[in-house]
């Protein structure tokens, strides 16, 4: 449902990998449905869900092909496993005559027994549930004796930089099960929102995955978008050392000379000022007054000089 809301809103990118429209209120969705569906405006979440169901159900019933992802791939049985809290996943994978599952190569686990461990970790870390409302296993097209399911079933394995990631220092990121726990506890993510990260993955996981996939020179700010409080490392259910990996990327930035000179100069000046307590105190008082002036009567800062990106998704 969240992805449908984003698609209606001119394909707006999600702000969270588990809860893609967490940045929107019920009033925002009510305005969007009223504008796009031409229906009376309503703000009750249950009514909005019913409205979306009435629009989407005929599309599921008439679709010739369903495209899904997969949370895990089980090598022992050749199955895909999908966990959801909505029924849309099963409608998409069982009603159309053709089902195509697209997922990354890192999702493969050896056996059903192995996947049960991950199945206990994922919902607890993502939404606090013991298990999601729906856990769906798909193992090929429907058999002759079965009454439902697709006539054809295809799995598309996506590499897109994952094999290269496996061969490098960031290989531990391939353990990520996409639960979103790291961003839920990240003070930087909470301050700037998911859109400020500029690509598919927000939060601490995005600070590492985005530079790894698109190139460090194309995502210079992300490894520095962390306070190194280690909350992400503590809550990660698969024990990825996220702060350590971000620190390695910062070191690589310095070694390759990727940090722009204004940032290097600013850090040098800050380091000098931090050694002068009286001067540092004066500077912070001036900065506070400047930010109050920037906020004006709204008490909101929409843009900060020399700080591009961080305020693109949220006001200060």
What are these regions (language model features)?
Residues 145-173, 184, 188-303:
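Ferredoxin-type iron-sulfur electron-transfer modules in oxidoreductases and energy-metabolism complexes
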Residues 53, 136-143, 270-274, 307-311:
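Amphipathic alpha-helical surface "interface" segments used
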Residues 1-168:
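The feature marks the mature, well-folded catalytic cores of soluble enzymes
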């Amino acid at each position: 449902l969240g992805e449908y809301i984003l698609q209606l809103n001119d394909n707006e990118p999600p702000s969270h990998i588990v809860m893609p429209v967490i940045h929107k209120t019920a009033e925002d969705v009510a305005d969007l449905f009223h504008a796009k569906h031409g229906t009376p405006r309503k703000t009750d979440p249950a009514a909005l869900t019913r409205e979306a169901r009435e629009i989407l159900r005929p599309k599921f019933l008439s679709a010739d092909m369903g495209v899904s992802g997969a949370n895990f791939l089980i090598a022992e049985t050749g199955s895909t496993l999908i966990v959801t809290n909505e029924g849309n996943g099963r409608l998409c994978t069982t009603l159309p005559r053709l089902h195509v599952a697209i997922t990354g190569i890192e999702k493969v686990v050896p056996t059903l027994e192995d996947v049960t461990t991950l199945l206990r970790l994922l919902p607890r870390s993502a939404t606090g549930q013991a298990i999601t409302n729906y856990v769906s296993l798909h193992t090929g097209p429907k058999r002759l004796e079965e009454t439902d399911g697709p006539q054809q079933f295809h799995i598309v394995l996506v590499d897109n930089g994952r094999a290269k990631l496996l061969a490098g220092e960031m290989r531990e990121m391939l353990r990520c099960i996409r639960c979103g726990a790291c961003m839920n506890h990240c003070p930087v993510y909470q301050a700037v929102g998911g859109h400020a990260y500029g690509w598919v993955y927000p939060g601490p996981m995005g600070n590492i995955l985005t530079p790894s996939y698109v190139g460090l020179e194309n995502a210079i700010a992300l490894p520095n978008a962390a306070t190194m409080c280690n909350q992400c490392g503590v809550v990660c259910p698969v024990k990825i050392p996220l702060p350590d990996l971000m620190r390695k990327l910062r070191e690589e930035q310095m070694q390759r000379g990727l940090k722009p000179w204004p940032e290097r100069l600013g850090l040098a000046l800050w380091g000098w000022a931090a050694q002068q307590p009286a001067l540092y105190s004066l500077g912070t008082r001036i900065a506070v007054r400047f930010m109050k002036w920037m906020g004006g009567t709204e008490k909101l800062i929409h843009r900060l000089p020399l700080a591009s990106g961080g305020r693109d998704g949220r006001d200060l």
